[in-house]
């Protein structure tokens, strides 16, 4: 999973964060009685905390990954902005604030009883028609040593003229990632990547009844506004990555326990930016961002994720339960995975000579769930299907090659012409085959659907075919 990105390279990244800066206050206490004055809980406050919020929390997330970060935006000339700057300086974040006398620092006060949020108070005034040439010049200077830019738009006015920051960064060849709150995505035209949540995305395009509709509307926006990709975060459903080219990729959520989703989007865009700066592509970056989101929602409040936490989570995913299993052992492993709320994806094939098309297909299949099972035709089964000269590689050799791929969790052999019986035993959440199949043609598909599962296809990577490779070798 995302093994092509060396996350230790995060510390070499330099990222500029520009946007709506906020201060988050938290009052914690116990709510054990109802007020005699009104039917509301009385909170006995025993702890007060202040944290950076908005674009400042994005910068904090970037810094937690070890990257160098410059933060710029608008604040009030008040105690809140000075408190915020002190908090950020402690994390080695370089702040460039434009302070306004008649504008308060956006502050959000949350009151919690037994760690449950009871009330939020907002202290803010939205900027209208704001543009500061001095801040834009500072931004231009910062671009000269940056590898990526994050524009954190909370619709508070700091990015009223968002076109200029996008254009100046793109002129220097830098990726521009935008966390959008505006319902007018044309404002972000030319940006590299947008990271809306599902609610924000549907506020722009309308309700999407299916994943196909979601992908279609996202792709239309990509072409209309010259984006390279859109990453839609969907809470418990995970994420969907839609790029200019290729099929959309669904990434299943990793979180088993969710305590607080506050600031999870900030973590996602921070990891995306750091991963792109470290040389990753959108898919690899999204895998890591999805993993980070699963970690941060287990924490209370607007929290961050560190490289050691990411590394441990990656190790747990890649190290657990990989290998060739018997059918009996597979069923036990599947039962254990289901007990932990994991989504099971299954596919099958001969996989006689593994090629890049197979790897692309298997990675896309793994992205649909937590565990990927690959059922492999044994030698006699391949011979019946492909002819007496096949397979080229023995069953054991084929399975050993497959287990070397990190996308695959379990490999299991079967002897029949189709894996229908095995699929009926496993009953995966998602059954996958290549795009040259119709869902109605896929063995075992009917039973999976009856059990509430899905039968999906993945487009075939053009130019790759085992049969053509064999023919080429023979000739």
Curated annotation (Swiss-Prot):
Residues 346-475 are annotated as: Cytidylyltransferase. Keywords: ATP-binding, Carbohydrate metabolism, Kinase, Multifunctional enzyme, Nucleotide-binding, Nucleotidyltransferase, Transferase. ATP binds at residues 197-200. The keyword Metal-binding does not apply. CDD domains: RfaE_like (cd01172). It is an enzyme of class 2 (transferase). Its EC number is 2.7.1.167, 2.7.7.70. The keyword Nucleotide-binding applies. One of its GO terms (biological process) is ADP-L-glycero-beta-D-manno-heptose biosynthetic process. InterPro entries: Bifunc_HldE, Carboh/pur_kinase_PfkB_CS, Cyt_trans-like, PfkB_dom, RfaE_dom_I, RfaE_dom_II, Ribokinase-like, Rossmann-like_a/b/a_fold. Pathway: Nucleotide-sugar biosynthesis; ADP-L-glycero-beta-D-manno-heptose biosynthesis; ADP-L-glycero-beta-D-manno-heptose from D-glycero-beta-D-manno-heptose 7-phosphate: step 1/4; Nucleotide-sugar biosynthesis; ADP-L-glycero-beta-D-manno-heptose biosynthesis; ADP-L-glycero-beta-D-manno-heptose from D-glycero-beta-D-manno-heptose 7-phosphate: step 3/4. GO terms for molecular function: ATP binding; heptose 7-phosphate kinase activity; heptose-1-phosphate adenylyltransferase activity; phosphotransferase activity, alcohol group as acceptor. Residues 1-321 are annotated as: Ribokinase. The active site is at residue 266. GO terms for cellular component: cytosol. It holds the Pfam family PfkB. It catalyses: D-glycero-beta-D-manno-heptose 7-phosphate + ATP = D-glycero-beta-D-manno-heptose 1,7-bisphosphate + ADP + H(+); D-glycero-beta-D-manno-heptose 1-phosphate + ATP + H(+) = ADP-D-glycero-beta-D-manno-heptose + diphosphate. In the N-terminal section; belongs to the carbohydrate kinase PfkB family. Homodimer. HAMAP family: HldE (MF_01603). Catalyzes the ADP transfer from ATP to D-glycero-beta-D-manno-heptose 1-phosphate, yielding ADP-D-glycero-beta-D-manno-heptose. This is Bifunctional protein HldE.
């Amino acid at each position: 999973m995302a093994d092509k990105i060396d996350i230790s390279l995060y510390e070499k990244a330099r990222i500029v964060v520009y946007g709506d800066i906020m201060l988050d206050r938290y009052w914690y206490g116990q709510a054990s009685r109802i007020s005699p004055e009104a039917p509301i809980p009385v909170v006995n406050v025993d702890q007060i905390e202040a944290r950076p919020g908005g674009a400042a929390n994005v910068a904090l997330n970037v810094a937690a990954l070890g990257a160098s970060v410059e933060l710029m935006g608008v604040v009030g000339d008040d105690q809140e902005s000075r408190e915020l700057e002190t908090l950020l300086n402690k994390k080695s974040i370089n702040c460039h604030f434009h302070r306004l006398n008649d504008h308060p620092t956006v502050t959000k006060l949350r009151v919690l009883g037994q760690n449950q949020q009871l009330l939020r108070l907002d202290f803010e005034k939205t900027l209208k028609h704001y543009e500061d040439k001095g801040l834009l010049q500072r931004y231009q200077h910062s671009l000269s040593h940056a590898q990526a830019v994050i524009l954190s738009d909370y619709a508070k006015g700091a990015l009223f003229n968002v076109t200029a920051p996008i254009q100046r960064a793109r002129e220097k060849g830098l990726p521009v990632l935008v966390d959008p709150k505006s319902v007018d995505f044309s404002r972000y035209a030319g940006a590299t990547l947008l990271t809306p949540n599902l609610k924000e995305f549907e506020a722009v395009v309308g309700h999407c009844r299916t994943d196909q509709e979601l992908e279609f509307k996202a792709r239309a926006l990509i072409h209309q506004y010259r984006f390279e990709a859109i990453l839609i975060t969907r809470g418990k459903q995970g994420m969907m990555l839609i790029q200019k080219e290729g099929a959309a990729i669904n990434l299943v959520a990793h979180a088993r326990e969710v305590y607080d989703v506050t600031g999870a989007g900030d973590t996602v865009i921070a990891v995306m930016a750091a991963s792109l700066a470290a040389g990753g592509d959108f898919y690899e970056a999204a895998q890591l961002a999805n993993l980070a989101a699963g970690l941060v929602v287990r924490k209370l409040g607007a929290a961050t994720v560190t490289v050691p936490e990411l590394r441990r989570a990656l190790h747990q995913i890649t190290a657990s339960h990989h290998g060739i299993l018997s059918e009996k052992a597979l069923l036990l492993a599947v039962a254990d995975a289901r007990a932990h709320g994991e989504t099971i994806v299954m596919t099958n094939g001969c996989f006689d000579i593994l090629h890049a098309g197979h790897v692309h297909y298997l990675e896309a299949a793994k992205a649909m769930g937590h565990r990927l099972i690959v059922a492999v035709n044994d030698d006699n089964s391949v011979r019946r299907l492909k002819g007496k000269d096949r397979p080229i590689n023995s069953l054991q050799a084929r399975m050993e090659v497959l287990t070397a791929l990190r996308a695959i969790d379990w490999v299991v052999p079967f002897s029949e012409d189709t894996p229908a019986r095995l699929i009926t035993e496993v009953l995966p959440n998602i059954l996958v085959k290549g795009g040259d199949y119709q869902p109605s043609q896929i063995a075992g598909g009917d039973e999976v659907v009856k059990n509430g599962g899905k039968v999906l296809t993945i487009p075939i990577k053009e130019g790759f075919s085992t049969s053509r490779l064999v023919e080429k070798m023979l000739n």
